[in-house]
């Protein structure tokens, strides 16, 4: 209750400290609890408004039956806790969906180019949080390629090797 009443005080904290605390949340065994707490208290809207915009965003689409924020939490939950780059990539992987929404005549939605858009959007966010250039580049590359293996066949060894070299 005290956090909700004073959530705007987060603006008085240095961005480096906010970055460090976000990283601590992301590498815990249950980062979704921390991110949900940030969302529920209003802090997420201040420190990561781009992620907060995904809360409640539920276009009709074939891939997800929940809002994009909860889908993002599920992706984060299924990544390794000792890999900050992967956790950051999971956090931002669908941030491009807000700018790429297209609707089909039947009402269903899709997001052409959302991976590329997300890779672009994440860079200034991570820069704002004072992440180093190597982290920003690695996260952006993973987001850009996060749909590469979304195929209806088993990728060849060569395709997997090329993806790993790019990422």
Language model feature labels by segment:
Residues 1-87, 91, 95-113, 117-133:
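Glycine- and charge-enriched loop/helix tracts that form the active or gating conduit
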Residues 57-66, 70-77, 131-167:
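Histidine/acidic-rich helix-loop-helix segments that form or flank divalent-metal centers
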């Amino acid at each position: 209750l005290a956090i909700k009443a004073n959530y705007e005080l987060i603006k008085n904290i240095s961005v480096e400290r906010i970055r460090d605390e976000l990283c601590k949340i992301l590498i815990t065994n249950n980062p979704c609890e921390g991110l949900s707490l940030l969302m529920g208290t209003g802090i997420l809207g201040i420190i990561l408004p781009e992620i907060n915009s995904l809360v409640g965003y539920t276009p009709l689409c074939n891939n997800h039956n929940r809002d994009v924020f909860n889908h993002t939490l599920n992706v984060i939950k299924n990544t390794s806790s000792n890999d900050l780059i992967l956790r950051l990539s999971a956090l931002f992987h669908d941030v491009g969906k807000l700018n790429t929404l297209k609707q089909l005549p039947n009402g269903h939605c899709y997001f052409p180019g959302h991976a590329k858009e997300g890779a672009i959007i994440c860079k200034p966010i991570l820069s704002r949080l004072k992440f180093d250039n190597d982290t920003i580049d690695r996260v952006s590359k993973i987001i850009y390629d996060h749909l590469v293996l979304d195929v209806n066949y088993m990728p060849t060894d060569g395709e997997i090797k090329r993806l790993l070299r790019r990422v």
